[in-house]
Amino acid sequence: MQFIDQARITVRGGRGGDGIAAFRREKYVPAGGPSGGDGGHGGPVVLEADSNLQTLLDFKYKRLFAADDGRRGGPNKCTGASGRDLVIKVPCGTEVRHLATGILLGDLTDPGERLTVAFGGRGGLGNAHYLSNRNRAPEKFTEGRDGEEWPLQLELKLLAEVGIIGLPNAGKSTLIAVLSAARPKIADYPFTTLVPNLGVVRRPSGDGTVFADIPGLIAGAAQGAGLGHDFLRHIERTRLLIHVVDAGADDPVGDLRVVEKELEAYGHGLVDRPRLLVLNKQELLLDEQLPELSNELEQVSGRAPLCISAAMGRNLDQLLERVWKELGIA
């Protein structure tokens, strides 16, 4: 499935039905009064969060969503039927903004949560409303009003408690694969992961915690370089970050600095988010090299790294123990 996490759509509420001019036509009532009914109201457009959806792909080819119009009024003061609600399903974690102003209209995070984004127009009035002492046979009626129409920006931000970050090829996908049932694409070259991967990791209680493997950042990601800018938004909701550094890289300390700089440049409080530092691929270094590199990383970041090997399954239990402690999970 193609992963789409941004979409622009236009929503339009239904037009209100017209009122009508009509008069009573009954036997033995030669001068029946006005009986024109009101038009029905136009239907609204409603967004609803659906936990079964994982992407905004449905909005790639359809951009205009219009609710049903109200029906015109009828004789005998019958009100026309109102237009039905148009309910549009979106993934949980979808932010909705007005496209022109950027104003946040809603953040749909819980399954079944709804947000009305365009109201339908009011139905017109029938001539029965205009009966007066001066005018016993009014022919005046009003037309229904147009519904609201708005351009919207939809942004999906994944609902994960733990985000796994790091430069390309640091081993993030391998880590989420061994910790959970996720099966991301894994290969020994940069940018293997082109979309965020979600995995559920079991807590000691048996409940699940969602981890997200975020595609590799590079220098300048916060300004749009590489893939990072497109996916940094997905760690905005996380409670904890796992920063993975490749022990076999040419300059692990420099790699650490790059990611920290990008988190700070992106903003949204990411640089201050609780974070665990993980030195992955420890099998690539000699035993005497690990302490030296660990000390360098701690001096730069202020965090003591945990040395692991995701590929060989080393120290993963210790990593999870630290995760649960940071999250306050028993």
Swiss-Prot record:
Domain Obg, chain residue ranges per copy: 1-159
Q: Name one GO molecular function term.
A: GTP binding
- Keywords in alphabetical order: ATP-binding, Cytoplasm, GTP-binding, Hydrolase, Magnesium, Metal-binding, Nucleotide-binding
**Its GO CC terms?**
cytoplasm
Q: Which residues form the OBG-type G domain?
A: 160-328
E.C. numbers = 3.6.5.-
Supply the PROSITE patterns for this chain.
G_OBG (PS51710), OBG (PS51883)
Q: What class of enzyme is it?
A: hydrolase
Cofactors needed by this protein, per the record, are: Mg(2+)
Would the keyword Isomerase be found if you checked this record's keyword annotation? no
The family database entries (SUPFAM superfamilies) matched by this protein are listed as: Obg GTP-binding protein N-terminal domain, P-loop containing nucleoside triphosphate hydrolases
Q: Which GO terms describe its biological process?
A: ribosome biogenesis
Residues the entry annotates as binding ATP:
166-173, 191-195, 213-216, 280-283, 309-311
Q: Does the keyword Transmembrane apply?
A: no
Localisation per UniProt entry: Cytoplasm
Where Mg(2+) binds, per the record, is at: 173, 193
- Assembly and interactions? Monomer.
Q: What does this protein do?
A: An essential GTPase which binds GTP, GDP and possibly (p)ppGpp with moderate affinity, with high nucleotide exchange rates and a fairly low GTP hydrolysis rate. Plays a role in control of the cell cycle, stress response, ribosome biogenesis and in those bacteria that undergo differentiation, in morphogenesis control.
Family, according to the entry, reads as follows: Belongs to the TRAFAC class OBG-HflX-like GTPase superfamily. OBG GTPase family.
Q: Any idea what this protein is called?
A: GTPase Obg
Question: Which organism's genome codes for this protein?
Answer: Parasynechococcus marenigrum (strain WH8102)
Q: Which gene encodes it?
A: obg
